[in-house]
Amino acid sequence: MKASELREKSVEELNAELLGLLREQFNLRMQHATGQLTQTHQLKLVRRNIARVKTIITSKAGA
């Protein structure tokens, strides 16, 4: 997801997005641990999306 799309969302929507990404990250970590995950780059993408959402939440809280 692009940062410009995230900036248009409200803080509540961003928190919901963050929760979904954290759940997805957990599921991917479990799949990776059991050897079921073949596309390991998904972990990196989800981690970066979490960072994007957290950054925008912080910037909106300070504004």
Swiss-Prot record:
GO terms for molecular function: structural constituent of ribosome. The keyword Ribonucleoprotein applies. The keyword Signal does not apply. GO terms for cellular component: cytosolic large ribosomal subunit. Transmembrane segments: none annotated. Pfam families: Ribosomal_L29. Signal peptide: none annotated. Keywords: Ribonucleoprotein, Ribosomal protein. One of its GO terms (biological process) is translation. HAMAP family: Ribosomal_uL29 (MF_00374). Belongs to the universal ribosomal protein uL29 family. This is Large ribosomal subunit protein uL29. It comes from Shewanella oneidensis (strain ATCC 700550 / JCM 31522 / CIP 106686 / LMG 19005 / NCIMB 14063 / MR-1).
